[in-house]
Amino acid sequence: MMASGSAAMANAQYYAIANQVSQLIQPALSGSFNYKGYVDVSYLKGLGDRNADIFEITTTQGFRYADWFFMGIGAGVEAMFTNPQHSFDGWDDPEQDSWSIDPSRSRSKTGWLIPLFTDFRFNFGSPKSVGFFLDLRVGATFLVSDNYLEIGDGYMTRSECFYLKPALGLRIPLSDSNPKQALNIGVSYQLTTSRYWYYQSSDLTLNALGVTMGFEW
């Protein structure tokens, strides 16, 4: 039951995002809301004993429902870099059972993931002047390799992960004539949860803190 918890949460987020696509397309066809797009680049440093550094590029497409509120859906690519400890090798564990790792699969210190998320963004201040923004992304991220990802003293054993990423920063318009175009610079936190193997199966929580830079139009 515990092994299916993270997967169920990630799958629920995936289907929620898919169901929102039609709701976001309808305003575009009717012209009732303003379309907006974002491209963001992030680098985050892993925190804690079990950690991973993350480099991420994402794009978000959606609609501005008011000057202060945007909602959309997004996707991207992220590289996860780990610094594993080598005090444990689960491949040599004689106590393996049906919940443990698969010795036929390889291990890696770098993982490539695809995040899919719903994005909520709140702007504070006039869109024509420098102001603050608060961004919240909720979704799932998927490990695209069959290799186990070495983290800490064990291994990430599930490809579907829960994904949460809030950010706080400055929105800087590029021109008075077209305030829809702006640069965004902020501080980001990312939470990723999955399954983990270290002599037995357990939950894995990854925390990372870093910076995000982006462009909106």
Predicted regions and their residues:
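Outer-membrane beta-barrel translocator domains and adjoining extracellular loop/strand segments
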Residues: R50-I54, P84-G90, V144-D153, Y196-L204
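Helix-adjacent hinge/juxtasegments
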Residues: G90-L143
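Predominantly the C-terminal beta-signal and adjacent terminal strand-loop region
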Residues: E78, P84-Q85, L113, G131, ...
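Short glycine/proline- and aromatic-enriched beta-strand/turn motifs that initiate or cap beta-hairpins
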Residues: M9-R64, E216
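Transmembrane beta-strands of outer-membrane beta-barrel pores
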Residues: V41-L47, V77-F81, F122-F124, V138-D146, ...
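Structural signature of outer-membrane beta-barrel channels/translocons
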Residues: G62-R64, W68, R121-P127, G169-S175, ...
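Short loop/turn motifs that connect adjacent beta-strands in outer-membrane beta-barrel proteins
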Residues: I25-Y35, N51, W68, G125-F132, ...
